[in-house]
């Protein structure tokens, strides 16, 4: 019989993850040294990559930082990579770490302005097809200049606030302190139909906005973290990155927006729900009340945020400094001129990005293993052995399939560094490298909307507080994303294969 202490260790290991998941991770850790001894470092390294992808695919069971971190720690101890190689990877990708540390935090301080923008949109437009199109387009536009995670967080904040307002009224708990929006027990039958329609309405808007972040995120250097990785390797600044990717990103953006309208008109794949008139009236009264409460200080803060957004866009377009440093500039400007000087208030802005920043360091440790064991060299050589006109399309497919089940930052890092090594070795022209870089960028960004695992914004939406409130499950997200996946993936592949 096991002792209480050993039971406590077992319960503490990976927290609330399922028992089968804990045992699987332990099995990986026990298998790797044995495999290294029996099969050698290359086979062992391939298995490690597969194990790490498994932890990414199971991100809803346990955040990948802990199991993935244990795996790469073991890899370093086994000599599959060296700490020096990991440090070299981190130095090489320091601009990406700066982006995650400061740009995401900088946009956090613009949330009030963005919340106001989306709230006005939700109540000001009565046509559901037009509203969905505007949500998708606005999310795309904001993600092109800001950060997809933060844009998604803003849309979630709007949805949570409005859902809670109506749910509280529908359940008759306007003044109740122990109000719980997650339960419908106190919602009378009279309001249940409106509540379910409102849930479907919010689900569709959330999905349109999430897809919009992918449509806009692929277009620019700062739209997604992997874009900065690719742009850094290719030596592209903001305007040059946009120009290189535009032959693929612009047609896909147009097709994605058209898909948005068609889905609302056809009412297929869970789209098309309308905002009930009774719900609109409650939300409009709430918005008017909030507007009346907004004093001179709050209005001044909104003006500062708008000016900081303008500084951000101009700074990015002119590339006055590294992207992360521009994010730090935004933090300083907004906090200084809105009176946010408390250390704990400022610290909240960094909570969202730092766990992912730590996970990115683990990514780079796996990349160091791949480099030191030359794992992807045969694959890249096989692609480069194809006729030049077939290479971009094949890279798009290879990136897309892996990005749909894994993390697109991880996938992009592997492929762009391998292709850059081939360029440095003289195996391709600079022009062809640029074409392959676009294929890698679009391949990791577009088909990855297929599952919540592929896009950080999708995973963030699925694990957020709004998902259970509007009944947005993993399977429902995959189903609602399917038409977008087919259109964006199919047209993206065609554009990469024929228009570059």
UniProtKB/Swiss-Prot annotation:
Topology versus the membrane: Multi-pass membrane protein
GO cellular component: plasma membrane
InterPro entries to which the protein is assigned, alphabetical: Na+/H+_antiporter_NhaB
UniProt source species: Pseudomonas aeruginosa (strain UCBPP-PA14)
Catalytic reactions on record: 2 Na(+)(in) + 3 H(+)(out) = 2 Na(+)(out) + 3 H(+)(in)
Subcellular locations according to the entry: Cell inner membrane
Protein name: Na(+)/H(+) antiporter NhaB
Major subcellular location class: membrane
Lineage: Bacteria, Pseudomonadati, Pseudomonadota, Gammaproteobacteria, Pseudomonadales
Family membership: Belongs to the NhaB Na(+)/H(+) (TC 2.A.34) antiporter family.
Molecular function as annotated in GO: sodium:proton antiporter activity
Cysteines engaged in disulfide bonds, as pairs: none
Pfam families listed in its UniProt record: NhaB
Gene: nhaB
Transmembrane segments: 28-50, 68-88, 98-118, 121-141, 145-165, 205-225, 244-264, 311-331, 350-370, 394-414, 449-469, 477-497
Function: Na(+)/H(+) antiporter that extrudes sodium in exchange for external protons.
Assigned keywords, A-Z: Antiport, Cell inner membrane, Cell membrane, Ion transport, Membrane, Sodium, Sodium transport, Transmembrane, Transmembrane helix, Transport
